[in-house]
Amino acid sequence: MSKNTKRFTELLKKIDSNKNYLMDEAISTVKTLASAKFDETVEIALKLNVDPRHADQMVRGSVVLPCGTGKKVRVAVIAKDAKADEAKNAGADIVGSDDLVEEIQKGNMNFDVLIATPNLMGLVGKVGRILGPKGLMPNPKTGTVTMDVAQAVNNAKNGQVNFRVDKQGNIHAGLGKVSFTQEQLKENMSAFVKAINKHKPAAAKGRYIKNASLSLTMSPSLSLDTQELLDTK
């Protein structure tokens, strides 16, 4: 048995596989699973009762986690003139227009989030095939296509999490670091679940959240009580 397999097996003993955990106990339990040599991320996974092949059942949006994500985020902004100045003053790491698009075309993407003003989306479209697969394409639904670039930069720097359901109806997100307090993780988790519930498509039928789990980067997952999640609004 490898060292990693043995570690994973030991962690499984701390989880009741027949139980659906309420948020408070789920958080306190995953905190006991920290075993890596780095500050692991607390991750939530949701299986939604939607069929994203239909446009009216797509779940996509963003939420600013009240206690942040614990990650340093590099933000790039495609803007000109006064809007470029606003972005710089708000703390954007990279600001440009044609020059920034040229760098992206060369494969130089030293940023985690890309924001653009609506009038320059035609320019951004030139590199859409590069940005899209990396999840970096600006989008109005995540607040990254906007004239309020200062607010968008602040959101990105202060814990904005973008979410989008995949083809199987799954959504994954990081809720912060395991070093966060119980209260911080609970606040972040509640905010994220509220956002998911808020984005429930009108066309979605039946039980919206089919199942859910919580884990750390390097830990097994535990099942969450979906009724509590559905009631978090």
From Swiss-Prot:
Q: Which InterPro entries match?
A: Ribosom_uL1_bac-type, Ribosomal_uL1, Ribosomal_uL1-like, Ribosomal_uL1/biogenesis, Ribosomal_uL1_3-a/b-sand, Ribosomal_uL1_CS
Q: Name one GO biological process term.
A: translation
Q: Which UniProt keywords apply?
A: Repressor, Ribonucleoprotein, Ribosomal protein, RNA-binding, rRNA-binding, Translation regulation, tRNA-binding
Pfam families xrefs = Ribosomal_L1
MF annotations from Gene Ontology: rRNA binding; structural constituent of ribosome; tRNA binding
Residues in a coiled coil are none
What does UniProt give as GO cellular component?
cytosolic large ribosomal subunit
Question: What Gene3D superfamilies does this protein's entry cite?
Answer: 3.30.190.20, 3.40.50.790
Q: How does it assemble?
A: Part of the 50S ribosomal subunit.
Family indicated by similarity:
Belongs to the universal ribosomal protein uL1 family.
Q: Give the protein's function.
A: Binds directly to 23S rRNA. The L1 stalk is quite mobile in the ribosome, and is involved in E site tRNA release.
**Protein name as catalogued:** Large ribosomal subunit protein uL1
Report which gene this protein is encoded by: rplA
